[in-house]
Amino acid sequence: PLISGMKLRERSVGNIVAELEECVNKYDIRNFFFRADTFTMNKKSVIELCREIINRRLNIAWVANSRVNTIDEERLTWMKKAGCWLVAFGIESGNDEIQKIIKKGTTRAQAREAVKLCKKLGVKTYGFYLIGFPWETKEMIMDTLQLAKELRCNFSEIHIAVPYEGTEFHKIARDFGILTETAVGHNYFSNPAI
């Protein structure tokens, strides 16, 4: 299935804070992970959310996903004040050509800047990388490994690229005839593994 789609869907700040308050006050939950890939996309909403977390004295610790090109000092400063202790980045590749092919819309330079900013402000980092694209050369893979080594995120994961249905990678893999019908079906997330 298409994992996230192309349309940005946001919850309102009020809706998010109400849920956080319920978790804190009713269940004493104080650790959260904002899983949205686009959490930092809307600067105004991020800052408003952080202000609300602070103003309501929720005293929570949290982690968020972010793109490397949607983080800046003001946003990250507010996030840290509101309890964010780690930002996870989908860096994907250390090769700008691969980034263009997969239409990531980010560069190595932006990854370096984002991780550097987090280190400056004392926010831990988690880097996610992908290797194994059919058009990827050994040198391109080494670029990714070198970038991961250079960035020295607090945590890193390197995954083998999977052509999920509905993605550009799936279309390319099918066009090249390298994808079997059963490799990653349309109901990949619906079927139990065992």
Predicted feature residues:
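Short, solvent-exposed beta-strand edge segments and adjacent coil->beta transition regions
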Residues: A36, F128, N191-A193
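C-terminal accessory regions of radical SAM enzymes
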Residues: K124, E139-I194
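Radical SAM [4Fe-4S] cluster-binding motif and immediate context
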Residues: P1-Y126, Q146
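A broad, structure-centric signal for solvent-exposed, well-ordered loop/edge residues
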Residues: M41, W78, G105, A109, ...
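Short, solvent-exposed turn/loop segments enriched in Gly/Ser/Thr/Pro and often Arg
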Residues: R35-N42, R67-V68, L130-W135, H159-E168
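Short, well-ordered beta-strand elements within core beta-sheets of diverse protein domains
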Residues: G5, G132-F133, I194
